[in-house]
A protein has these predicted regions:
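Switch II (G3) loop of P-loop NTPases
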Residues: 35, 134-136, 140, 149-176
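Iron-sulfur cluster-binding cysteine motifs and their immediate structural context
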Residues: 73-90, 99-115
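Walker A (P-loop) phosphate-binding motif
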Residues: 1-26
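P-loop NTPase switch/communication element
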Residues: 39-57, 121-123
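C-terminal lobe/tail of nucleotide-utilizing enzymes
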Residues: 206-289
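Conserved nucleotide-binding/hydrolysis micro-motifs of P-loop NTPases
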Residues: 36-38, 171, 193-195, 221-225, ...
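Inter-motif core of Ras-like GTPase G domains
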Residues: 173-194
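Short beta-strand-centered segment that lines the nucleotide-binding/catalytic pocket of NTP-utilizing
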Residues: 29-42, 113-118
Length: 289
């Protein structure tokens, strides 16, 4: 079984739209949305939830007022100022360090585990999909990414599937690190802007750190051809191949608004031909088909 992850380094490069297009081309695969902080693959996939589970991680202090003597030690020890003068814990400010629980002489502080979000196993018109939703201001998205990927692999094994297509999170932080470990290949989708090039460079270094084969695809290349050439030159210096250049096309946005892949909306145009060519090249290099 192979896993391909599509990442970008920054948001807005067209990563998810390209990933959805691959989903309509690939066969015998499971889908995984690892962008748990701001998941949007479901907007195109329109998944039908089969199983829903809570994601629990971290702890938040809660003061039992029946036991609390208001000695003030917890407020004194808390470095996050999460405990008010009325001895109530602000769940947003609380970092879950547990120092108040440890030092409370009356053992009046509970420390329950947090329910941070949900993860789902769903059916889509392109195959099974594992995705998640992280709650507002919740952390530990890296753990949720690892969980989603683990469940996607388990699901693919149960169904005898050969491929996992993963829509990765933007950036280079903890969620991206969690999404890169153990994958077979990375496709980096970038755009010809200063921030696009800069963030692509950072994510290229991250993929290199994990020793994961990576390729680059430049979306909307014709909006700034000079920058597209700079990106291609950088990729060459790093020994990476630029699979192709995708021209700017409003079809991407129009299909997304309709909740469709570009092949469902208008697959006969030049954009569809380019993406099909990219997918064939990826398939050959990964030895998928």
């Amino acid at each position: 079984m192979k896993e391909l992850i599509v990442i970008s380094g920054k948001g807005g490069t067209g990563k998810t739209s390209l990933m959805a297009a691959f989903a309509s081309l690939a066969e015998n695969k499971a889908l995984c949305d690892a962008d748990v902080d701001a998941a949007d693959l479901h907007l195109i996939m329109n998944p039908k939830v089969v199983r829903r589970s809570d994601f629990q991680s971290g702890n938040t202090a809660a003061i039992n007022n029946d036991l609390c003597t208001e000695c003030g030690l917890c407020r004194e020890m808390c470095r996050w100022d999460a405990i008010s003068a009325a001895y109530e814990v602000n769940s947003i400010d609380c970092e879950g360090c547990g120092v108040c629980v440890y030092f409370c002489p009356e053992k009046a502080i509970n420390f329950p585990i947090n329910t941070c979000g949900e993860w789902f196993i769903s059916d889509t018109r392109f195959g099974p999909m594992v995705h998640a939703h992280l709650g507002i201001a919740e952390e530990n998205s890296g753990k949720l990414v690892a969980l989603v990927r683990k469940e996607a692999r388990k699901l693919a094994e149960q169904k005898g599937l050969d491929l996992i297509l993963t829509d990765g999170p933007p950036g280079v932080g903890c969620p991206v690190i969690a999404s890169l470990s153990g994958v077979d290949a990375v496709l980096i989708v970038t755009e010809p802007t200063v921030s696009g090039k800069h963030d692509m460079q950072r994510v290229v270094d991250l993929a290199d750190h994990f020793k994961v084969p990576a390729w680059v695809c430049v979306n909307k290349f014709d909006l700034n051809r000079a920058m597209a050439l700079e990106i291609e030159a950088f990729a060459g210096e790093k020994g990476l191949g630029v699979l192709d250049h995708i021209p700017f096309d409003p079809v991407f946005t129009k299909s997304m608004v309709q909740g469709q892949t570009i092949f469902e909306f208008d697959g006969k145009g030049p954009l569809g031909s380019t993406i099909t060519r990219i997918w064939r090249t990826l398939s050959e290099r990964m030895g998928i088909y």
